[in-house]
């Protein structure tokens, strides 16, 4: 049995989120949540919410036992960039891209 949870357009770059995702891929749920709880990174908080959402989906929709689940796959894809401008000298402006990403977590037995 596989259960998914997806967070689209998370306001953090995919590169930073992949660092956290690589730490919990393939781990049991309890160990993955423990690692995410004690990680100081902003991405850890966002990934933890997606993992908890997948757990709730498994319990509510499939009636699964949470203790048996593990993080089978976690995929972080690049999302759309928010384009902003910052003021520069002599009346010019430079473009800044604020990165987003899509996080997909799949839990299985």
Swiss-Prot record:
InterPro entries: Ribosomal_uL22, Ribosomal_uL22_bac/chlpt-type, Ribosomal_uL22_bac/org-type, Ribosomal_uL22_CS, Ribosomal_uL22_sf. It comes from the Bacteria. One of its GO terms (biological process) is translation. GO terms for cellular component: cytosolic large ribosomal subunit. Keywords: Ribonucleoprotein, Ribosomal protein, RNA-binding, rRNA-binding. GO terms for molecular function: rRNA binding; structural constituent of ribosome. Belongs to the universal ribosomal protein uL22 family. This protein binds specifically to 23S rRNA; its binding is stimulated by other ribosomal proteins, e.g. L4, L17, and L20. It is important during the early stages of 50S assembly. It makes multiple contacts with different domains of the 23S rRNA in the assembled 50S subunit and ribosome. The globular domain of the protein is located near the polypeptide exit tunnel on the outside of the subunit, while an extended beta-hairpin is found that lines the wall of the exit tunnel in the center of the 70S ribosome. PANTHER family: CHLOROPLAST 50S RIBOSOMAL PROTEIN L22-RELATED, LARGE RIBOSOMAL SUBUNIT PROTEIN UL22M. Part of the 50S ribosomal subunit. This is Large ribosomal subunit protein uL22. It comes from Polynucleobacter asymbioticus (strain DSM 18221 / CIP 109841 / QLW-P1DMWA-1).
């Amino acid at each position: 049995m596989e259960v998914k949870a997806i967070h689209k357009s998370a306001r953090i770059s995919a590169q930073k989120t992949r660092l956290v995702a690589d730490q919990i891929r393939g781990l049991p749920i309890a160990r993955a949540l423990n690692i995410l709880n004690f990680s100081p990174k902003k991405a850890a908080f966002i990934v933890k919410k997606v993992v908890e959402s997948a757990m709730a989906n498994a319990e509510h929709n499939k009636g699964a036992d949470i203790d048996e689940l593990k993080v089978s796959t976690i995929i972080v894809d690049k999302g759309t960039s928010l384009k902003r401008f910052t003021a520069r000298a002599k009346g010019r402006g430079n473009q800044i891209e604020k990165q987003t990403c899509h996080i997909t977590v799949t839990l299985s037995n």
